[in-house]
């Protein structure tokens, strides 16, 4: 689960991190009062969407010459003018795709005197089985480009979970950042604090880009991105309330209600599979035969008829879907249950696109019999390769 920048900063501020004063607004009418509550005279007006690249982004409704989703303002009137242009419009960034995202919230923040911009993130480094700091002196820009063009400028410092962030770890991170003076002193409290927040809140990612050294020598968190482990949200009611469903795909929201592992993609073949590995293999073979998957959908091993039907309805609700491939290997999951769920969903929502079903495993013959006797236009497949060929051929006509 992702949250907005202003929410992430409020959470970090609760741990004692140095962040600027700021106010989140939902209406243009709130912009003037928000700016007046800040020290000024420099302000930053930031679009709040769950995507990076906001500063370089462009608004669909504005001219190509218009400023992006993060703007400086040198007066309160300028803050209001920016708010009028940004709120309610669609921001397109490198991460949103062509559709972009509507800006429903702005964060008006006090400006900062920046001397240096750094990149700092915490994530789970699965290669060593530890939480690690990923740091670079090249902050405030596209870290993916830095990793591609100058990977030597990115360093990773893994943290021993038993010891936590030690003085030696802080020294290593500070050295990587080339910190000195007041910034090096700030580091002694900031980095252990970030590690503590990451662990206590069950984060999957904490990204600060940029972490700045101000002209007075001190550190400040200028931007913050947080992603939380969805499987751990049951013990974080304070985090769950921060969820903004308007930023999420409606199909993914519905899938979460049924405990389905569903991710919307850009292709045209809907997939319903049991098991993440088989789901990825199914998507791979669709690509092998020249098409793209419209989704990742793992119904899990113990799904009942209702859950299968819900998954099928979510897939068919995607207007991009031109065909559906159901690929089930029944172990815990029984093939007859899958068949009954698919038929129930088809009878409810109709079948307007080709449907290919491959069943194997527990109760496979019963599952095939149920499908054959349903009277529905369902194409059976013998194996995964056969299934992929048939759904691609059906779409190609």
Swiss-Prot record:
GO BP, one annotated term: tricarboxylic acid cycle
Binding site for Mg(2+): 209, 223
Keywords: ATP-binding, Ligase, Magnesium, Metal-binding, Nucleotide-binding, Tricarboxylic acid cycle
Residues annotated as domain ATP-grasp: 9-254
Cofactor(s) listed in the protein's UniProt record: Mg(2+)
UniProt: substrate binding residues: 274, 331-333
GO molecular function, one term: magnesium ion binding
Record carries keyword Magnesium: yes
Annotated binding of ATP, by residue: 46, 53-55, 109, 112, 117
Annotated EC: 6.2.1.5
Enzymatic reactions: succinate + ATP + CoA = succinyl-CoA + ADP + phosphate; GTP + succinate + CoA = succinyl-CoA + GDP + phosphate
InterPro entries: ATP-grasp, ATP-grasp_succ-CoA_synth-type, ATP_grasp_subdomain_1, Succ-CoA_synthase_bsu_CS, SUCC_ACL_C, Succ_CoA_ligase-like_bsu, Succinyl-CoA_synth-like
UniProt cofactor note: Binds 1 Mg(2+) ion per subunit.
Transferase as UniProt keyword: no
Listed GO CC annotations: cytosol; succinate-CoA ligase complex
Pathway: Carbohydrate metabolism; tricarboxylic acid cycle; succinate from succinyl-CoA (ligase route): step 1/1
Similarity comment: family membership: Belongs to the succinate/malate CoA ligase beta subunit family.
Protein function: Succinyl-CoA synthetase functions in the citric acid cycle (TCA), coupling the hydrolysis of succinyl-CoA to the synthesis of either ATP or GTP and thus represents the only step of substrate-level phosphorylation in the TCA. The beta subunit provides nucleotide specificity of the enzyme and binds the substrate succinate, while the binding sites for coenzyme A and phosphate are found in the alpha subunit.
Subunit record text: Heterotetramer of two alpha and two beta subunits.
The protein, known as: Succinate--CoA ligase [ADP-forming] subunit beta
Biological source species: Rhizobium johnstonii (strain DSM 114642 / LMG 32736 / 3841) (Rhizobium leguminosarum bv. viciae)
Lineage of the organism: Bacteria, Pseudomonadati, Pseudomonadota, Alphaproteobacteria, Hyphomicrobiales
């Amino acid at each position: 689960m992702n949250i907005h920048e202003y929410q992430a900063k409020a959470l970090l501020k609760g741990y004692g991190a140095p962040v600027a004063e700021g106010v989140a607004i939902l209406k243009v009418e709130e912009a003037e009062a928000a700016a007046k509550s800040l020290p000024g005279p420099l302000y930053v007006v930031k679009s709040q969407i769950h995507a990076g690249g906001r500063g370089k982004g462009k608004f669909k409704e504005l001219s190509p010459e218009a400023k992006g989703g993060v703007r400086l303002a040198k007066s309160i009137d300028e803050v209001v003018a920016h708010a009028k242009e940004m709120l309610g419009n669609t921001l397109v960034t490198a991460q949103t795709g062509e559709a972009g995202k509507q800006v429903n919230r702005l964060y008006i923040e006090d400006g900062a005197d920046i001397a240096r911009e750094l990149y700092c993130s915490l994530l789970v480094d699965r290669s060593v089985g530890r939480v690690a700091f990923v740091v670079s002196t090249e902050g405030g820009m596209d870290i993916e480009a830095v990793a591609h063009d100058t990977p030597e400028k990115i360093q990773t410092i893994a943290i021993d979970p038993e010891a936590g962030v030690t003085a030696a770890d802080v020294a290593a991170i500070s050295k990587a950042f080339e910190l000195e003076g007041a910034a090096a002193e700030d580091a002694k409290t900031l980095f252990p604090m970030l590690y503590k927040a990451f662990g206590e809140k069950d984060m999957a990612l904490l990204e600060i880009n940029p972490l700045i050294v101000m002209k007075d020598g001190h550190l400040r968190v200028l931007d913050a991105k947080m992603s939380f482990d969805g499987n751990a949200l049951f013990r974080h009611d304070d985090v769950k309330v921060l969820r903004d469903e308007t930023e999420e795909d409606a199909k993914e929201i519905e899938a979460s209600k049924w405990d389905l592992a569903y991710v919307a993609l850009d292709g045209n073949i809907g997939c319903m599979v049991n098991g993440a590995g088989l789901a990825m293999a199914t998507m791979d073979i669709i690509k092998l035969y020249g098409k793209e998957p419209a989704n990742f959908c793992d119904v899990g091993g113990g799904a009942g008829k209702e859950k299968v039907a819900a998954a099928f309805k979510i897939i068919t609700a995607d207007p991009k879907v031109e065909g559906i491939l159901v690929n089930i290997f029944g172990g815990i999951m029984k093939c007859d249950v899958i068949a009954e769920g698919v038929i129930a969903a088809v009878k409810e929502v109709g079948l307007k696109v080709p449907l290919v079903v491959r069943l194997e495993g527990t109760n496979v013959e019963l599952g095939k019999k149920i499908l054959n006797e349903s009277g529905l236009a369902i194409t059976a497949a013998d194996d995964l390769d056969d299934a992929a060929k048939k759904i691609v051929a059906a779409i190609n006509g």
